[in-house]
Amino acid sequence: MGILDGKNVLVTGLTHNTSIAYEVARIAQAEGAKVVVSNFGRAMRLSNRVIQKLEPVPPLLELDVSEADHLTTLADRLREVGMDRVDGVVHSIAFANAATSMGGKFLEAPGADVDAAVRISAYSLVSLAMACKPLMTEGGSVVGLTFDATVAWPAYDWMGVAKAALESTSRYLARYLGPEGIRSNLVAAGPLETIAKKAIPGAEAFNDVWGQRAPLGWDAKDNGPTAKAVVALLSDFFPATTGEIVHVDGGLHAVGA
């Protein structure tokens, strides 16, 4: 028996087989979960190709968290693909305009781009959870992905601010949904060689930091440890844990220079 036997899980933001979301979906299926995945726009075509590698091939829904109708219809569309109950939601959604809001552009970023970064990367945790809530009739687990937002990283800029907002948002979500048996936690991963990271100007600087300082070492090409942490938080192994940030970074967050 797997740790997710009988559970229904929505995994958002699955774009490529190097993405954390893909590995989460793969492991969740291996652990017994029924999985539905989502993406939107032009990325849907890539997602559809990638999920053919999963067994079974999960349903793919279009979900743009900046489109209200995508959210208001989500529960009905999940029912249409046979998911009448949701036990777990994986928030793998983030966006900041790399040309204007990252790579050293912190002081010059347009307000509209900052608004979009925070709305899509942080507020969407709430809007996604609330869209799924009608199907979370037996409680459940919401798990998001962050990158340690307690310090100012080079090049990360307004995405770092958005991640700080995400971390606070998860704590408030834990507070308000806890009485209904719904947990909200985040996994703070070290830098991984994903499409998202490649879009960040200057992100290669992270690799040297982790390579030199992480007590356990760090393999930026292995998203397995991060995905396993997400799956564990989706399971019943953490029934009294909410509002938490689990660090999967080789221990770097715990050490000084």
Model-derived features: positions:
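Aromatic pocket-lining residues of Rossmann-like dinucleotide-binding sites
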Residues: 28, 177, 233
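Short, flexible catalytic-loop segment of classical short-chain dehydrogenase/reductase
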Residues: 184, 188-199
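Conserved mid-core segment of classical short-chain dehydrogenase/reductases
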Residues: 52, 59-72, 76-115, 134, ...
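C-terminal helical subdomain
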Residues: 123, 186, 204-241, 246-250
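Catalytic loop of short-chain dehydrogenase/reductase
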Residues: 13-22, 94-134, 138-179, 190-194, ...
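Rossmann-like NAD(H)/NADP(H) cofactor-binding core
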Residues: 143, 180, 185, 244
